[in-house]
């Protein structure tokens, strides 16, 4: 068919040229001459003055059509559309290699095709049995990597299209826009996910105006009004009468809001008293929901403002309360005011003891304080301070998770870890550890830190106070 198409055309002159290109096919096979004839402008160019050698070369080209044939005329014809709309894409070894392909993210099912080998009649003529499959027939993770399960080398044949075959790595291209964007950020050697400040990272006008106008909004008289309003709010912290404990209840003096200041010695009780009357307080926390909600908020604020001795006493209060609940076989509710404040208590203790624990734990080869609170392993417990932090971290994790109750296994198998705990051990054991490490450690700075942890009196550190507003 190709020779008959050539014979129907007139020979071309010497200025005509036939060039091969590696672009997409515009016209192939027997349609080449017909498409060229429709786009002909200068018909005088087809005067039969061509030599026999030129006609023979034209017959060879048409008989063995290249990938693309472009015929140049004195006036360029209009580019014809391909006659075969289902033309196959060339194999991996031909054409442009770094062409960007659309990446399908959410339509994975559309890319899942049969892994069977194509039928012989469906295989294109240019794609042999040992050539690479088309890119569009493979998912991205197979085009950019090697598949396991095949002992053949990377240079062996890849005729099979099964998931057990191994594929070569595809050279990944870089987006031009991304490269320019990274160069503008001054970080062209890293990906776009590298943190960096963009050009729009600036303070907006409203925020700058609000900061500048604070001196006109806040005055000394305004500060006095703030404190006066806060005192009025604290005079009636709870509505609906609070916990409304009976006068005969041993917890009545401590359940009032704002009655008097807290005095540890005035509220000292024994372990036997806590076991005997602790259930009554447990039920009041459960029944008086409005008062318990206010108690949770106030206790959380109190836990964050305590000094070291008060914080250690609060740790003993929390662990003693949990031990009483385990002894009475009651659920440890996370909305209990004492248990829910374990998060604030842990944060305050870490803030107060972090400078001391840094040297104390490193000298004994124990994990850091952050690792103790994150991993919460009982195997890391070696002394009273580590026991206190691990147990409080386990309770705080249950509270922060949103669970209704703390599992008994959080306190060891069936809560048996607290069986050896004696109320008051957190305060006594931590003070003992600080003093023992102070005597043992030879570092001068550690001695200062240990002493200041025990007696936090101001010696040095603050240098000025600058306030131009009031």
UniProtKB/Swiss-Prot annotation:
Keywords: Activator, Early protein, Host cytoplasm, Host nucleus, Host-virus interaction, Metal-binding, RNA-binding, Transcription, Transcription regulation, Zinc, Zinc-finger. One of its GO terms (molecular function) is RNA binding. It is found in: Host cytoplasm; Host nucleus. GO terms for biological process: regulation of DNA-templated transcription. GO terms for cellular component: host cell cytoplasm; host cell nucleus. Zn(2+) binds at residues 359, 437, 441, 446. Residues 94-107, 178-187 have a biased composition (Basic residues). Residues 73-85 have a biased composition (Polar residues). The keyword Zinc-finger applies. A zinc finger (CHC2-type) spans 359-446. Homodimer. Homodimerization is required for transactivation. Associates in a complex with RNA, and host export factors NXF1/TAP and ALYREF; these interactions allow nuclear export of viral transcripts. Interacts with three host shuttling SR proteins SRSF1, SRSF3 and SRSF7. Interacts with host SRPK1. Interacts with IE62; this interaction enhances IE62 transactivation. Multifunctional regulator of the expression of viral genes that mediates nuclear export of viral intronless mRNAs. This immediate early (EI) protein promotes the nuclear export of viral intronless mRNAs by interacting with mRNAs and host NXF1/TAP. Belongs to the HHV-1 ICP27 protein family. This is mRNA export factor ICP27 homolog. It comes from Equine herpesvirus 1 (strain Kentucky A) (EHV-1).
